[in-house]
């Protein structure tokens, strides 16, 4: 009966419209064939592809010539990793290697900029000018013994004052602050900040920084946190906006304009006349820096074949860490914060040459069907790599010639909302990134909170290099884990380690402390005797180190994972979302410092709960190791979720694979060809009387 009603509604089928073009990731039946193979493994067969039924024309025959222009482009051109990249020589082509190296060099400058807050905005020890070093007068904010500038120490029994908790709210950077007591009440402490001028003991190798330049102490301490806040907010907005623009106009223009404007705003920061101007310009500097980070990351991914993507991305991370390790020496060389800021920004001048050296992403041109520009770039690359036309075994160039009349087809990141699987994958990775970078600050603050009891952590350089060394060890471990477990397995392992470290630090140590104070049994008495405060502090530091180690890997791997599973047409937009989520995680540090560490414990508990949710959600992600990058939204939808452990021989999987899925997209065309069906025919066979 349903077939009869369709037949009546459709009439003779002459007025039926062809299937709609691709929208929000859905393809017409005839276009699905062009997208299915790209989700498979590189170099493998098409055993896991969805095999769609051929599309039927309303008259029962093939599509007419008037519909040919709206059909999908050639499958050969969409298979970039399998056809186009091998034709250009892959990563073995000399010009491609040069381009990859050119994406590594700016990572050093980016590392300088990302960690500059630790030096420009470090809050030094200070005392009233004219009070004498180590002398406590009216308004003196810090008491202690002064040797030389690098050896300032404070007696551990010194009570906190309004100024002292204001000046020590950040010992090295926004993520390694010691625990601070609640602000003391008014009264005698009101006289501690009656000074109008101070002398400073800056620990970062500089003679003057932003805090000492404009006396951002006592009642003005909050302006330091706003300055840190402004850079991160600029990064967040930059990731979101430049990501969408890069998907629409291309990676190359965004990279060029971001470089030009970071030179303008970055150098103007060094000429700031007050802290308000400094914070405002830092926002725009962060905005432009985000455009550079995002476009270079996408270009690096799109240049590489499947087997080289991860290692090339990790090399860029190591170069950025080199900038982190070199920053203290650079600060000691400059001695003044304005010179340091100018020296950090000036190397970006070299990136102006990229306009004439670095071409547009060929993968993006092919994915957005800009075949005219793609043809010119392919000819240019073959000339640079000395590739002869005879090596085009698969016939890429002849197919490209046939498609030159196509109009470009660009996509915005909002299209992902209508997809079935892709938006879920991106949301999961955004939450992972937010959790990883957010809880990293909790572990760092917990570790630096024991600096009074661990003399090594009292030194600024010890704090700084401890954090940098943990990040370096995390990246090294990530290389090994991802090699053996893949992207999804590695992310799951590091998230489990993060959750364990967080829960043990929050629960186990508090439980031990409770039992040690009220021993009700012989076992508890032994715990009370054996578990001293120093031992608990050592456990807490150990858990903090493990937590920072694992959470750094979670954040970095989430960003890389998103770059692989997001289709080329919206890759920068997807990267912008996950990087902005990471920025929100890092933003919690200056926000909590701005409120004098209030709500820190709740902050840690919330992120600890998020780690448990993320462990479950990671299992929903596909595995992208050794797979071709998806080129359009339909390719991203074809990424399958495979089990973590391979099936044993003879064991049947419980879930259907892509090869076993059936395509019912042509059923609605049965009514259109109903005139050719015998009487009594149904969708499932012949109707018996």
Curated annotation (Swiss-Prot):
Keywords: Glycoprotein, Ion transport, Membrane, Transmembrane, Transmembrane helix, Transport. The keyword Transport applies. GO terms for cellular component: membrane. Glycans are attached at residues 24, 274. GO terms for biological process: monoatomic ion transport. It is a multi-pass membrane protein. InterPro entries: MFS_sugar_transport-like, MFS_trans_sf, Sugar_transporter_CS. The keyword S-adenosyl-L-methionine does not apply. It comes from the Eukaryota. It is found in: Membrane. Residues 165-177 have a biased composition (Polar residues). GO terms for molecular function: transmembrane transporter activity. Residues 1-55, 162-188 are annotated as: Disordered. Belongs to the major facilitator (TC 2.A.1) superfamily. Organic cation transporter (TC 2.A.1.19) family. This is Solute carrier family 22 member 23. It comes from Mus musculus.
């Amino acid at each position: 009966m349903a077939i009869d009603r369709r037949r009546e509604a459709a009439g003779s089928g002459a007025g039926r419209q062809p299937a709609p073009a691709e929208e929000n990731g859905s393809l017409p039946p005839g276009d699905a064939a062009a997208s299915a193979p790209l989700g498979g493994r590189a170099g493998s067969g098409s055993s896991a592809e969805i095999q769609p039924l051929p599309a039927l024309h309303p008259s029962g025959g093939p599509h007419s010539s008037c519909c040919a222009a709206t059909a999908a482009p050639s499958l050969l051109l969409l298979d970039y990793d399998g056809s186009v990249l091998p034709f250009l020589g892959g990563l073995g082509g000399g010009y491609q290697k040069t381009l990859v190296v050119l994406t590594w060099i700016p990572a050093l400058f980016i590392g300088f900029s990302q960690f500059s807050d630790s030096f420009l905005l470090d809050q030094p020890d200070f005392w009233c000018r004219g009070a004498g070093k180590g002398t406590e007068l009216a308004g003196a904010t810090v008491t202690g013994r002064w040797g030389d500038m690098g050896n300032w120490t404070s007696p551990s029994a010194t009570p906190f004052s309004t100024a002292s908790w204001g000046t020590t709210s950040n010992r090295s950077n926004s993520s390694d602050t010691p625990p601070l007591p609640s602000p003391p009440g008014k009264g005698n402490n009101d006289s501690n900040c009656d000074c109008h001028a101070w002398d400073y003991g800056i620990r970062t190798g500089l003679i003057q920084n932003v805090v000492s330049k404009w006396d951002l102490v006592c009642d003005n301490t909050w302006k330091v946190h706003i300055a840190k806040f402004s850079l991160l907010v600029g990064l967040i907005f930059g990731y979101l906006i430049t990501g969408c623009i890069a998907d629409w106009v291309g990676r190359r223009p965004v990279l060029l304009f971001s470089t030009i404007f970071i030179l303008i705003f970055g150098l103007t920061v060094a000429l700031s006349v007050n802290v308000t101007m400094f914070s405002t310009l830092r926002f725009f500097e962060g905005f432009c820096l985000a455009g550079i980070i995002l476009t270079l990351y996408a270009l690096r991914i799109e240049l590489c074949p499947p087997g080289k993507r991860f290692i090339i991305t990790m090399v860029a991370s190591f170069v950025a860490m080199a900038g982190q390790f070199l920053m203290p020496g650079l600060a000691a060389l400059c001695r003044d914060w304005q010179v340091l800021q100018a020296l950090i920004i000036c190397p970006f001048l070299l990136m102006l040459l990229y306009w004439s050296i670095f071409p547009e992403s060929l993968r993006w041109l092919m994915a957005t069907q800009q075949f005219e520009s793609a043809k010119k770039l392919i000819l240019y690359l073959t000339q640079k790599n000395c590739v002869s036309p005879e090596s085009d075994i698969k016939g890429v160039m002849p197919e490209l010639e046939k498609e030159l009349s196509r109009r470009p087809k660009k996509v915005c990141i909002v299209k992902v909302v209508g997809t079935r699987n892709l938006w879920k994958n991106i949301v999961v990775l955004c939450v992972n990134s937010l959790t990883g970078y957010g809880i990293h600050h909790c572990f760092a603050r917990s570790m630096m909170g024991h600096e009074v009891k661990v003399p090594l952590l009292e030194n600024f350089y010890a704090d700084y290099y401890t954090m940098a060394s943990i990040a370096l060890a995390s990246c090294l471990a990530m290389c090994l884990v991802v090699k053996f477990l893949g992207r999804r397995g590695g992310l799951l392992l590091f998230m489990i380690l993060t959750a364990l470290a967080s829960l043990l630090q929050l629960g186990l140590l508090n439980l031990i402390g409770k039992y040690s104070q009220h021993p009700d049994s012989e076992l508890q008495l032994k715990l009370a005797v054996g578990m001293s405060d120093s031992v608990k502090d050592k456990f807490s530091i150990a858990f903090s180190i493990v937590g920072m180690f694992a959470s750094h890997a979670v954040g970095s791997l989430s960003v890389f994972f998103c770059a692989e599973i997001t289709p080329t047409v919206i890759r920068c937009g997807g990267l912008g979302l996950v990087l902005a989520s990471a920025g929100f995680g890092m933003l919690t540090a200056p926000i909590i410092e701005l409120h004098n560490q209030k709500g820190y414990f709740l902050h840690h508990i919330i992120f600890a709960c998020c780690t448990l949710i993320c462990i479950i959600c990671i299992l929903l992600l596909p595995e992208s190791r050794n797979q071709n990058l998806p080129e359009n939204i339909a390719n991203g939808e074809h990424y399958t979720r495979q089990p973590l452990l391979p099936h044993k021989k003879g064991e049947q999987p419980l879930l259907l694979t892509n090869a076993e899925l059936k395509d019912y997209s042509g059923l609605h065309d049965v009514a259109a060809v109903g005139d050719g069906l015998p009487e009594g025919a149904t969708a499932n066979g012949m109707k018996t009387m």
